[in-house]
Regions:
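Short beta-strands and strand-coil junctions in structured, solvent-facing domains, enriched
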Residues: 12, 54-56, 75-77, 110-112, ...
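Primarily a LysM-type cell-wall glycan-binding module
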Residues: 30-62, 92-126, 137-141
Length: 145
């Protein structure tokens, strides 16, 4: 019953590591450890890792890097930081049902809140009748829908 050993069927050939050339792995490091995809407000997102770029994420998910910049309300020269939430599709106009009001905590920004709840930044400002100059302060109550 050693008939079922992996080697007997040459299954090792199908291991992911063996499939890619070293050159391809250097150009596409995510092939070895793809990003985990999460969902918020019915939209897929990933959490950036140290050294990630919009171009790398775009390649991994077959999305133009310009779209990723736009979906996430960022500037094209923004440098991704470990822990950044990066949406793979356009965010929504408002948060999902249970989330109606958010109370601002220390360190919050409008962009951070918009990323956390998957809401377009301009809609978060509009819903709360705030302009681009507004900086949230601890205790402020912001509508999410």
């Amino acid at each position: 019953s050693d008939v079922y050993k992996r080697q007997d069927y040459d299954l090792y050939k199908y291991d992911r590591k063996g499939v890619y050339s070293e050159r391809k792995l250097k150009k596409n490091p995510w092939l070895m450890s793809p990003h985990q995809v999460y969902i918020a407000n019915d939209i897929a997102y990933v959490v950036a890792r140290n050294g990630d770029t919009f171009k790398d994420l775009g390649k991994e998910f077959d999305i133009s890097w310009r779209k990723l910049v736009k979906y996430n309300d960022l500037q094209r020269d923004y440098t991704l930081m470990e822990g950044d939430i990066i949406y793979l599709k356009s965010k929504k106009k408002k948060a999902s049902k249970p989330y109606t009001v958010y109370v601002v905590k220390d360190g919050d920004s409008m962009h951070g809140i918009s990323q956390k709840y998957g809401i377009r930044l301009k809609n978060l400002y509009k819903m709360n009748r705030k302009d681009g100059e507004y900086v949230p302060e601890i205790g402020d109550r912001l509508r999410l829908r």
